[in-house]
């Protein structure tokens, strides 16, 4: 069955050992790294706009615990801000409306169960005057749909947030269909032709520009966006950290072709709908559109192995790290890979991938480059 983004682009569902719920620690670590940026943007909304009902949207929310961590963090920031700045009573706190958005294939059933647990946990604090006085009323809804389309009314949202989503494209470049390529070129490689690389770059430019235009329409004047996604440290597109990550996946798929487990034609027609941009590429699009003021942009790094918290260049156990990296990538890629090659190859594929990652880490400890962008809707004078 051919891959379809709107159907197949979602994280591995459920709560099993290969699920996204159990393998989303990298995203959790990224959320911790960008907390100060999120706090600054949230406080700016509270200070400048003073909304009675604050509408917050998490775009590409997925279905794991990080989604509710975001809700908890924003609620905490607002409660703390109101206490410090205004010493507000509970009846004067803003009401919070959270919209959790993702494509229809997302595991919304699991997400709604987490929301129910979250609401029950919040309810247990009722009656505790000290705690309740600091808790803004909070309402949470799911919102299926692509963030590459309009999903909110005009000027209705105060704060947009997105974590590890905007590296995903709305589609693989259309012009690549039917193009002759190497089995290893599922993403950008050093041997890929410049014309093919340009197609990946143009798809990013098209998608990111569209995303910003859509959010501009949906944000209130002075509204904020905090966007965190996989990028690259250097401007040279051939030296991106993601190139290694997905290159090893391509090699693993090629090994299954050699074993007769995967059809060569299926691998030759497979592209990842991904692009990891540089800071320069992101800034250029924001400035070119002129729709947003840029408050903050930075790059930080996270080890491939989410359980490796060391800052050095050595990997202490490459085999274990290889397995950890494979679990994380499987949780993200499983539905896409299964739609193209079938579910029966998944265990063998990611076993091979873990082996290749371990070998790679013996020679080079590699890290994800993560971009954090904080922007504010600009006032355009006609």
UniProtKB/Swiss-Prot annotation:
Keywords: Magnesium, Metal-binding, Methyltransferase, Plant defense, S-adenosyl-L-methionine, Transferase. Pfam families: Methyltransf_7 (PF03492). Because cv. Delprim is a hybrid line, AAMT1 and AAMT1I are likely alleles of one single locus. However, AAMT1I showed no enzymatic activity with all tested substrates. GO terms for molecular function: S-adenosylmethionine-dependent methyltransferase activity. Methyltransferase involved in the biosynthesis of methyl anthranilate in response to stresses. Utilizes anthranilic acid as substrate, but not salicylic acid. Produces exclusively the O-methyl ester. This is Anthranilate O-methyltransferase 1. Its EC number is 2.1.1.277. Changing residue 246 to W: Decreased substrate specificity and increased activity with benzoic acid and salicylic acid as substrates. Belongs to the methyltransferase superfamily. Type-7 methyltransferase family. SABATH subfamily. Anthranilate binds at residues 27, 168. Mg(2+) binds at residues 268, 270. GO terms for biological process: defense response; methylation. Induction: Up-regulated by herbivory and jasmonic acid, but not by salicylic acid. S-adenosyl-L-homocysteine binds at residues 20, 61, 66, 102-103, 146-147. It catalyses: anthranilate + S-adenosyl-L-methionine = O-methyl anthranilate + S-adenosyl-L-homocysteine.
